[in-house]
C-alpha cells in the first residue's frame, strides 16, 4: 500500500549570488523584498539542494515518486545528476517516477525560477509572485500496480454525484497503471459506515435518501474509497471526499443550491502572510478559515491561482462555495496559451472531487493592458471554454472583467456566467455608479448572470478622519464604502454572487500608499491576521445572527470635531450609546447605527445591545493628529 515520506527539513538554499543557507521548507526568497515596496523584489533562478537516504521499498514490486505541491513559478528537478522533470506553473501539484534514479544516498537539486518571461502565468498583476518551494515535498511509494499518478498531478479517482429526487447516483471513475487487477469501490457515510459498494474502473453507486452537502448550514461529506487488488491481494487504495449537491444559476434569481435560493456573499483570498509570504502552514490556512467563517461568508473566490489542497478540503468541510481559477491575468502573453491550458487542466484534474467548487475561472482582468493581441486573447478564451466544458460539464465557467471592460466586450460573453471587478466609489468617484452599472447590465443583458468578483477600498487602521474622502486610505472611508455596497447588493438580489476584495491585506510590491509601501490594504483584516478592521464587524453584522455589538472608530482616538459621529455595528435590533456613564440615545434599526455625540474633553463610550456591550475612549483635541493622514503618492493604483 502507498506510503508518504515528507522531505521538508535541512535543505540547502542557494541564492542567486551564491549565498548558501540551510533551512526547512516551506520557503520563499521574497518574504521580505516582495512586501516592502519599490516593485524591485528579486526575480530569477535560485536552487534548493537536499541529501536524503533511499526510502525503504521493494524494487521488484514498488515504485517511488517525487512529489511537489507548489514550486513558483517554474521548476527543473535534478536527482543524482539526472534531470527528472520540468514544470511551468507555480500553484499546482506535479510528480515523477524516480525509482530507477535512486541510490543509497541521493542528491536532489531543484532549480526554481520566478523570472520575467512571456510564457508562464502570472507575469503582470497586483500581487507579489513569490519564488520558492513553498508547499510540501514528498516521496510517494506505491505498488507497481497502482491508481494513476501520471495525469496532470491528479489523484487517479474521479467522483461525480448526480441527485435524483431524494436519491443519488455517484459515478466513480478510476485509472490504474496496469490492465490486470480488480477495483472495489466503497461509499462511507460521515460515521464511517458503508452505504454502497461497486466494482470496476467505472461504476455507479446508488444511494437512497441521500444526505446533501448543503453549504455552511450542513456541509455533509461522504467518503469514496477505491481499492485495487491483484491476484486477491490489496496493493493500492485512494479516497476522496464526496459532497452530494446540485446547483444552478439564474439571471433573475441568482444562485440556487439544492433547489433553493442561496445568496452567495463572500470574500476573495490571497494566500500570503506578513513576513512569511506564500510559505505558509496548515495553521495559517486554519486561521484564515476561522476568520472567514466568523464574518458569516458562505463563498470564497480563491484568487488568482490554485490554492493548497488543504484549503479546498477546509472549504468542503465548512460548506464554503468556491470559485477556483488559474492565474491567466492582466495581460495576454504572446507565448502563454499552452501554459493557460496546462494550468487549467491541472486545476480541474486535481480539484474535480471537491464539492465546494461550483465554477472554474478562465481569467482575471485580462483586458487591463489594452487591445494588444486581442484576437489571440479572445480565441484562447474560446479554447479554454470548450476544453473546460468537455472536462467538466457539471460546473459552470466564469471570468472576472476589468472595470473599464465595457458591458459588450466580447470576452465578457464567452464564459457561462460573468463577474466584474468594480471599484466605483474608490478608484472612480460616485457610489451611485454601482447601482447604475448593475441596472445598465440588466437592461442590456437581462438573461445573463452577473456578479461582482471584486469590490473594495483601502483602509489603514492607523489613518482616520471625521470627514473621510475617497483616496484618503482611512478606516472611516473604508467603512463608508462597504456600508454603501452592502445596501447596494440588497437592491439587486438577482446577482449570482459578490466577493469582497479582499478578506486580508496582501503583498503587492509595486504599490505605495497609505504610508506602507508594498501592500494592498483593502483587506477586512490586516496582513498579519492580528487586527480586525472596523468593516470586519460590519460584515459580521450583516452576515451573522448571533448577538454582538461593536463600537467602530475606536482607533480614531483623538478628534477635533465638536460633534462627532459614533458608528456601531450589531446584529441586535436596538442599541444604546452611553458617554461617561450617561445615556446619549437609544436607536432601533439593523446592522448599522449612527449617533451624534457632543464631545467632552474625555469620552468613555459604552454601547449596549441586549446582553452585549462594547466600549472605547476618545478625546477632544484642538489640532488634527498628523499621524492620522498619509502623504499622497502617484502609485496608489498599481495600474
Regions found by a protein language model. Give the residues of each.
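Secreted/periplasmic carbohydrate-active enzymes, especially glycoside hydrolases
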Residues: 1-306, 312-314, 318-322, 343-346, ...
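Substrate-binding/catalytic cleft of secreted carbohydrate-active enzymes
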Residues: 171-173, 289-292, 299-542, 546-564, ...
Amino acid at each position: 500500500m502507498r506510503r508518504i515520506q515528507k522531505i521538508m527539513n535541512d535543505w540547502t538554499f542557494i541564492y542567486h549570488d551564491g549565498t548558501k543557507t540551510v533551512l526547512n521548507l516551506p520557503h520563499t526568497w521574497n518574504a521580505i523584498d516582495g512586501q516592502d515596496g519599490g516593485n524591485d523584489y528579486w526575480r530569477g533562478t535560485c536552487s534548493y539542494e537536499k541529501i536524503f537516504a533511499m526510502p525503504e521499498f521493494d524494487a521488484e514490486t514498488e515504485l517511488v515518486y517525487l512529489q511537489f505541491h507548489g514550486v513558483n513559478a517554474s521548476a527543473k528537478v535534478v536527482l543524482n545528476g539526472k534531470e527528472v522533470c520540468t514544470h511551468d506553473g507555480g500553484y499546482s501539484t506535479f510528480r515523477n517516477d524516480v525509482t530507477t534514479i535512486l541510490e543509497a544516498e541521493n542528491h536532489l537539486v531543484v532549480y526554481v525560477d520566478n523570472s520575467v518571461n512571456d510564457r508562464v502565468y502570472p507575469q503582470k498583476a497586483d500581487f507579489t509572485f513569490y519564488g520558492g518551494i513553498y508547499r510540501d515535498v514528498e516521496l510517494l511509494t506505491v505498488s507497481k500496480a497502482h491508481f494513476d499518478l501520471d495525469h496532470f498531478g491528479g489523484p487517479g479517482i474521479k467522483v461525480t454525484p448526480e441527485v435524483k429526487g431524494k436519491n443519488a447516483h455517484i459515478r466513480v471513475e478510476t485509472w490504474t497503471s496496469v490492465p490486470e487487477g480488480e477495483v472495489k469501490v466503497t461509499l462511507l457515510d460521515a460515521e464511517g459506515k458503508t452505504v454502497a459498494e461497486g466494482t470496476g474502473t467505472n461504476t455507479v453507486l446508488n444511494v437512497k435518501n441521500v444526505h446533501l452537502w448543503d453549504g455552511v448550514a450542513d456541509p455533509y461529506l461522504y467518503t469514496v474509497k477505491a481499492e485495487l487488488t491483484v491476484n486477491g491481494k490489496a496493493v493500492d487504495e485512494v479516497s476522496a471526499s464526496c459532497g452530494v449537491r446540485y446547483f444552478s444559476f439564474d439571471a433573475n434569481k441568482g444562485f440556487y443550491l439544492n433547489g433553493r435560493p442561496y445568496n452567495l456573499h463572500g470574500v476573495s483570498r490571497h494566500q500570503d502572510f506578513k513576513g512569511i509570504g506564500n510559505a505558509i502552514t496548515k495553521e495559517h490556512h486554519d486561521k484564515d478559515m476561522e476568520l472567514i467563517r466568523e464574518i458569516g461568508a458562505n463563498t470564497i473566490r480563491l484568487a488568482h491561482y490554485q490554492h493548497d489542497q488543504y484549503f479546498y478540503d477546509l472549504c468542503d468541510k465548512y460548506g464554503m462555495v468556491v470559485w477556483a481559477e488559474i492565474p491567466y491575468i492582466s495581460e495576454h502573453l504572446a507565448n502563454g496559451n499552452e501554459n493557460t491550458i496546462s494550468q487549467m487542466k491541472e486545476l480541474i484534474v486535481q480539484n474535480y472531487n471537491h464539492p465546494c467548487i461550483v465554477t472554474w475561472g478562465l481569467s482575471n482582468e485580462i483586458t487591463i493592458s489594452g487591445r494588444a493581441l486581442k484576437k489571440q486573447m479572445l480565441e484562447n478564451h474560446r479554447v479554454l471554454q470548450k476544453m473546460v466544458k468537455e472536462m467538466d460539464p457539471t460546473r459552470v465557467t466564469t471570468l472576472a472583467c476589468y472595470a473599464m471592460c465595457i458591458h459588450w466586450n466580447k470576452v465578457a460573453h464567452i464564459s457561462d456566467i460573468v463577474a466584474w471587478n468594480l471599484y466605483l466609489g474608490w478608484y472612480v468617484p460616485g457610489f451611485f455608479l454601482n447601482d447604475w452599472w448593475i441596472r445598465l447590465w440588466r437592461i442590456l443583458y437581462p438573461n445573463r448572470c452577473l456578479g461582482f468578483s471584486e469590490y473594495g477600498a483601502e483602509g489603514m487602521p492607523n489613518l482616520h478622519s471625521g470627514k473621510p474622502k475617497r483616496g484618503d486610505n482611512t478606516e472611516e472611508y473604508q467603512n463608508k464604502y462597504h456600508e454603501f455596497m452592502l445596501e447596494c447588493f440588497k437592491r439587486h438580489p438577482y446577482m449570482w454572487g459578490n466577493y469582497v476584495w479582499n478578506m486580508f491585506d496582501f503583498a503587492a510590491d509595486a504599490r505605495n500608499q497609505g504610508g506602507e509601501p508594498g501592500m494592498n490594504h483593502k483587506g477586512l483584516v490586516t496582513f498579519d491576521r492580528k487586527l480586525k478592521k472596523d468593516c470586519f464587524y460590519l460584515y459580521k453584522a450583516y452576515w451573522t445572527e448571533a448577538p454582538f455589538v461593536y463600537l467602530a472608530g475606536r482607533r480614531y482616538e483623538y478628534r477635533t470635531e465638536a460633534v462627532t459621529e459614533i458608528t456601531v455595528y450589531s446584529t441586535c435590533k436596538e442599541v444604546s450609546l452611553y458617554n461617561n456613564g450617561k445615556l446619549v440615545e437609544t436607536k432601533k434599526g439593523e446592522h448599522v447605527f449612527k449617533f451624534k455625540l457632543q464631545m467632552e474633553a474625555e469620552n468613555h463610550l459604552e454601547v449596549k445591545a441586549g446582553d452585549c456591550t462594547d466600549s472605547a475612549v476618545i478625546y477632544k483635541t484642538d489640532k488634527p493628529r498628523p499621524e492620522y493622514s498619509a502623504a499622497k503618492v502617484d502609485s496608489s493604483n498599481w495600474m
